[in-house]
Curated annotation (Swiss-Prot):
It is found in: Plastid, Chloroplast thylakoid membrane. The N-terminus of the protein extends into the stroma where it is involved with adhesion of granal membranes and post-translational modifications; both are believed to mediate the distribution of excitation energy between photosystems I and II. Gene3D superfamilies: Chlorophyll a/b binding protein domain (1.10.3460.10). The modification N2-acetylarginine is found at R36. Keywords: Acetylation, Chlorophyll, Chloroplast, Chromophore, Magnesium, Membrane, Metal-binding, Phosphoprotein, Photosynthesis, Photosystem I, Photosystem II, Plastid, Thylakoid, Transit peptide, Transmembrane, Transmembrane helix. This is Chlorophyll a-b binding protein C, chloroplastic. InterPro entries: Chloro_AB-bd_pln, Chloroa_b-bind. The lineage of its organism: Eukaryota, Viridiplantae, Streptophyta, Embryophyta, Tracheophyta. GO terms for cellular component: chloroplast thylakoid membrane; photosystem I; photosystem II.
Length: 267
């Protein structure tokens, strides 16, 4: 079949020959043509939004200076700061945007997973080891790891089996996010909607644009939080809530500076 030059924008045409673009159709071996939506251009955000456009909030407020020409305020989380020029190349910028958003989402889930079990344990809920890095390490113990402290749920004794399950489950979700099959079609892999938006939060363009900003801001904070949790685990051997309680009880002796000056690796 000749190369296609025009994408379909509607599913019904009368008396008009239309060629299908390669990105909008796939020809199977039995001659069937399967259709797939192409990403439509997002509706422009209102010029009154403080998070988008040339007059958006900048990283240093009124002292920010002029932003790079390629940072136009089109995307959420663009505060006009890129001293290393990481976003100068459009393809690299698009790739880094996707990586950041995905890592933000995992970091938010991870931060919640680190804090919530410890919070429950401090309020009398008993389900085994509550400190995030100690709980996972129980899989290497002789008795293995019981999810939520209940052997009737999941009794894990093999790190390889857990790894395989994670690959399958996470791979299935990522496959749907990117490709959309078999559960449906995906217009934008970064914001797939559909089954990923059961509450319909993205139906209003203005609200959706603001939610994107909130997501990226909270996600960046969560990534820094996870880094802090890792450092705390290495230095103090305690969970984040216990470290917070220690700091509030004695801020002079329990702070980052005090631990940094007294920390000896391996002890």
């Amino acid at each position: 079949m000749a190369a296609s030059t025009m994408a379909l924008s509607s599913s019904s045409f009368a008396g008009k020959a239309v060629k299908l673009s390669p990105s909008s159709s796939e020809i199977t071996g039995n001659g069937k043509v399967t259709m797939r939506k192409t990403a439509s251009k997002a509706k422009p955000v209102s010029s009154s939004s403080p998070w988008y456009g040339p007059n958006r909030v900048k990283y240093l407020g009124p002292f920010s200076g002029e932003s790079p020409s390629y940072l136009t305020g089109e995307f959420p989380g663009d505060y006009g700061w890129d001293t290393a020029g990481l976003s100068a190349d459009p393809e690299t910028f698009a790739k880094n945007r996707e990586l950041e958003v995905i890592h933000c989402r995992w970091a938010m889930l991870g931060a919640l997973g680190c804090v919530f079990p410890e919070l429950l344990a401090r309020n009398g809920v008993k389900f085994g080891e509550a400190v995030w890095f100690k709980g996972g390490s129980q899989i290497f113990s002789q008795g293995g790891l019981d999810y939520l402290g209940n052997p009737s749920l999941v009794h894990a004794q093999s790190i390889l089996a857990i790894w395989a399950c994670q690959v399958v489950l996470m791979g299935a979700v990522e496959g749907y996010r990117v490709a959309g099959e078999p559960l449906g079609e995906v217009v934008d892999p970064l914001y797939p909607g559909g089954s990923f938006d059961p509450l319909g939060l993205a139906e209003d363009p203005e609200a959706f644009a603001e939610l994107k900003v909130k997501e990226i801001k909270n996600g960046r904070l969560a990534m820094f939080s996870m880094f802090g949790f890792f450092v705390q685990a290495i230095v103090t051997g305690k969970g984040p809530l216990e470290n917070l309680a220690d700091h509030l009880a004695d801020p002079v002796n329990n702070n980052a500076w005090a631990y940094a000056t007294n920390f000896v690796p391996g002890k």
